[in-house]
C-alpha cells in the first residue's frame, strides 16, 4: 500500500459525488452512492460504444448478456439514458438511432466470479503509467508507413497528438499469422491490442458452452483486443485467421499509458474549460462530463475558414484558444465584419437548431483552436440549452452568434 498512488481522477469524482449528495440529501446514502457510480460507469461504457467501430460493437453485443446481472444492468442503463437528467433528448428522425440502441449494451462485467493471472488495475492512469519506460521497437521507414496506413482511420488513434501517435508507432510489433492460427482465445489473458494490416480473421464466441458461433470478421484496417485491456477482463471472443495475415500488436502497458491517459487528460481539460463557458455554467458536473467526452479538438491556421456562409451546418463549435473573424455577405454582395469571437465564445448553433444554411463565415484570425460537437451529439447533449441559444439569436443583428 505504501507504493500506491491515488489516481488523478479520484478527487474530482469524489467532489462531484459530494455535490450530488448535498443536492439530493438521500436517506439511504450507500444506495445513493451505488446508483451514482452505476450511472457513471454506464455513461463511460456508452462513450466507448459510441466511438467503437461496428465490429467491436458486434463483439460486445454478443458477449454482454449472460455475464451481467440483469437488475444491475437495468438500473445502470436506466440512469444512463433517462430523460430525467435533461440529456436523454434524441432526434427521432435521425437515421443513426439504431446505432444508439446497440450502444446501450454494456461490455462484459469485469472479473465476475472468476480469477485470471492479470492483476487488478484501475482504468484511470496513474503516475506510474505516465512515467513508465516507453517501448521502442526498431522499424524501417517502410514499416512505419505501413503502420500509419493501417491505423490512420482507427477510432482509437484518431485524436492523439503527434507525440502520442509517435509512441504508438514506436511500440507496435509486427506479427505474421498463418491461416487457421488462433490469435486470441476466449477466456485468455489480454496482453495485446491488434490492428490488421492485411489478411482476414473470423471472430467466434462460445456462450454457455454451446459451441463457437461466428459473430463478425476483420479485414485490413480492423482492430481487436482493446476490451480486455481497457476493462482488465478475460478475452471476450476467439479470433482465428482465415488467411495469411499481417497484424500490428500494441502491448498492454503502452496501450493503457497512451490511449487511456489521453482520454483521461482530455476529459479533465475539457471539464475545466467548459466550466468557464457561460452557456454551460448552469449544467451539473455530470452533464459536463458527457459533453467533455463527446468534444473533439480541431486546430486552424491563420486565415482558415471554419464554417462558410451558405453551407449546411454539421457541427457546433466552442473556441478553446485564439480569435476568429465573423464575416457576412449581404444580398448586394457587400462584405460586413462583426465583432470577433474569443475564447469561450460559441458558434454554429443556429444552423443546427433551425436546419438552415450557415448565415455567416467564421475565419481564423491567427492560430485558432476549437472544441467541435457533431450535430447528433449537439441535439442529444445540448437539447436543454436550446431555448437559451434561441433567445440569443435576437442579438445577431449587432453580434451574430451563429456565424
UniProtKB/Swiss-Prot annotation:
Keywords: cAMP, cAMP-binding, Nucleotide-binding, Phosphoprotein, Repeat. Residues 87-103 have a biased composition (Acidic residues). Coiled coil: none annotated. The modification Phosphoserine is found at residue 117. 3',5'-cyclic AMP 1 binds at residues 156-278. CDD domains: CAP_ED, DD_R_ScPKA-like. Pfam families: cNMP_binding (PF00027), RIIa (PF02197). It comes from the Eukaryota. 3',5'-cyclic AMP 2 binds at residues 279-403. GO terms for molecular function: cAMP binding; cAMP-dependent protein kinase inhibitor activity; protein kinase A catalytic subunit binding. Residues 79-125 are annotated as: Disordered. Gene3D superfamilies: cAMP-dependent protein kinase regulatory subunit, dimerization-anchoring domain (1.20.890.10), Jelly Rolls (2.60.120.10). GO terms for cellular component: cAMP-dependent protein kinase complex; cytosol; nucleus. Tetramer, composed of 2 regulatory (R) and 2 catalytic (C) subunits. In the presence of cAMP it dissociates into 2 active monomeric C subunits and an R dimer that binds four cAMP molecules. Belongs to the cAMP-dependent kinase regulatory chain family. This is cAMP-dependent protein kinase regulatory subunit. It comes from Blastocladiella emersonii. The lineage of its organism: Eukaryota, Fungi, Fungi incertae sedis, Blastocladiomycota, Blastocladiomycetes. The gene is PKAR.
Amino acid at each position: 500500500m505504501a507504493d500506491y498512488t491515488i489516481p488523478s481522477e479520484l478527487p474530482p469524482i469524489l467532489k462531484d459525488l459530494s455535490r450530488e449528495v448535498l443536492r439530493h440529501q438521500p436517506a439511504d446514502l450507500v444506495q445513493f452512492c451505488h446508483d451514482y457510480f452505476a450511472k457513471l460507469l454506464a455513461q463511460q461504457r456508452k462513450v466507448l460504444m459510441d466511438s467503437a467501430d461496428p465490429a467491436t460493437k458486434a463483439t460486445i453485443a454478443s458477449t454482454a448478456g449472460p455475464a451481467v446481472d440483469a437488475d444491475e444492468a437495468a438500473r445502470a442503463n436506466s440512469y444512463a439514458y433517462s430523460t430525467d437528467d435533461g440529456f436523454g433528448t434524441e432526434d427521432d428522425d435521425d437515421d443513426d438511432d439504431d446505432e444508439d440502441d446497440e450502444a446501450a449494451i454494456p461490455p462484459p462485467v469485469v472479473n465476475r466470479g472468476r480469477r485470471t493471472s492479470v492483476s487488478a488495475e484501475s482504468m484511470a492512469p496513474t503516475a506510474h503509467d505516465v512515467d513508465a519506460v516507453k517501448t521502442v521497437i526498431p522499424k524501417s521507414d517502410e514499416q512505419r508507413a505501413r503502420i500509419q496506413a493501417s491505423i490512420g482511420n482507427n477510432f482509437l488513434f484518431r485524436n492523439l497528438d503527434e507525440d502520442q501517435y509517435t509512441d504508438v508507432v514506436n511500440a507496435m510489433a509486427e506479427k505474421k499469422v498463418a491461416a487457421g492460427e488462433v490469435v486470441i482465445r476466449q477466456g485468455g489473458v489480454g496482453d495485446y491490442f491488434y490492428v490488421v494490416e492485411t489478411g482476414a480473421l473470423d471472430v467466434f464466441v462460445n456462450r454457455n458452452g454451446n459451441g463457437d458461433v461466428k459473430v463478425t470478421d476483420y479485414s485490413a484496417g480492423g482492430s481487436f483486443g482493446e476490451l480486455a485491456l481497457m476493462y482488465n477482463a478475460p478475452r471476450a471472443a476467439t479470433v482465428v485467421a482465415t488467411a495469411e495475415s499481417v497484424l500490428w500488436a500494441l502491448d498492454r502497458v503502452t496501450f493503457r499509458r497512451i490511449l487511456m491517459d489521453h482520454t483521461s487528460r482530455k476529459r479533465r481539460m475539457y471539464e475545466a474549460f467548459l466550466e468557464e463557458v457561460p452557456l454551460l455554467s448552469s449544467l451539473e458536473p455530470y452533464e459536463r462530463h458527457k459533453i467533455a467526452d463527446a468534444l473533439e479538438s480541431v486546430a486552424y491556421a491563420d486565415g482558415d475558414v471554419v464554417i462558410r456562409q451558405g453551407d449546411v451546418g454539421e457541427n457546433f463549435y466552442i473556441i478553446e484558444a485564439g480569435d476568429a473573424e465573423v464575416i457576412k455577405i449581404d444580398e448586394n454582395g457587400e462584405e460586413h465584419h462583426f465583432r470577433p469571437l474569443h475564447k469561450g465564445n460559441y458558434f454554429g448553433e443556429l444552423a443546427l437548431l433551425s436546419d438552415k444554411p450557415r448565415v455567416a463565415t467564421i475565419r481564423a484570425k491567427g492560430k485558432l483552436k476549437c472544441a467541435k460537437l457533431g450535430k447528433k451529439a449537439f441535439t442529444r447533449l445540448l437539447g436543454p440549452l436550446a431555448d437559451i441559444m434561441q433567445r440569443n439569436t435576437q442579438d445577431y443583428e449587432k453580434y451574430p452568434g451563429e456565424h
